[in-house]
Amino acid sequence: MSLVGAIEAGGTKFILAIANRDGTILERARLDTRHPDETLCEAATWFEGAASRHGALSAFGIASFGPIDIDPGSPTYGTFTTTPKPGWSGARFHDALARFDVPLAIDTDVNGAALGEYLAGAGQGARTIAYTTVGTGIGTGVVTDGAPVSGISHFESGHLRPARPHGDDWPGNCPYHGDCLEGLASGPAILARWGHDLSAAPEEQISLVADYLGELACALVLLHMPGRMIFGGGVMKAPGLLEALRRTTRARLGGYIAAWDRDLSEMIVAPALGDDAGITGAIALGRSCIREASVAEGP
């Protein structure tokens, strides 16, 4: 029986799971994210125990925070790069999991969530989806025909600079770009600007954040032509924000894209898998490793 080890590596917690080849989770655990020497060692030890209970692992699938090298052809594949998470720059998943001697498939946390929603959630039935999380940071994963899309690295949609209304001169709080999307519409930016989150915010604040995110939604439509866009994360739970985003996206597109010039209640949606999107995607990454190994071995 081919078993998959899966990791959803977040900035505050790690979700670990061992699953059948069909994706059924046999056991799972949660770890706090600390220094990589502690966290990765603890994760590897948990997988050793889980494997002793369920059987040997055939592959790992990992959906991780970053920035992280996700190019399988790179000598630094699976290595954290310029992450602001203290101690994590230079840490490698391969080092911690070398004892298992199995292949690893590594992608970003948002790509993992996008893949999970594509396969088993709100993205089902669409050829291309774009999944955006708006929380501590802002990031987007795109999946086409069942595979995450990337270039030399993962997308950084949160660092696009939106057009801003006249008189909106708050400088933003991104340490790199100031008033990029992440510096204006992430959870920390909203708190820094107004001193509260959007859970009970006045309509004008909801509308302004929707305007910022509408810039991103329009860019995703124009660049990727998704059949569906999913917006998740803590900020998107604010009452009325998703509806405002639909309105501003349609208005900003100006009728130019026929498929998006209509009511967008089925085109811009909330996630369906909740907190399980990331681990579902990580399992799928691991399953792809097993399939590729089977093809390479031949009949």
Positions of predicted regions on the chain:
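Conserved G/P- and acidic residue-centered "switch" motifs that form tight phosphate/ATP-binding loops
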Residues: 8, 109, 135
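General beta-strand structural signal in soluble alpha/beta enzymes
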Residues: 104-112
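Conserved A3 ("GATE") glycine/threonine-rich loop of ANL adenylate-forming enzymes
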Residues: 13, 112, 136-138
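A charged helix-plus-loop insertion that forms the helical arch/lid used to bind
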Residues: 74-89
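ATP-binding/phosphotransfer module of carbohydrate and carboxylate kinases, centering on a glycine-rich
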Residues: 1-59, 68-76, 94, 98-103, ...
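Conserved NAD(P)H cofactor-binding loop of Rossmann-fold oxidoreductase domains
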Residues: 65
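Glycine-rich phosphate-binding loop of actin/hexokinase-like ATP-binding domains
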Residues: 126-182
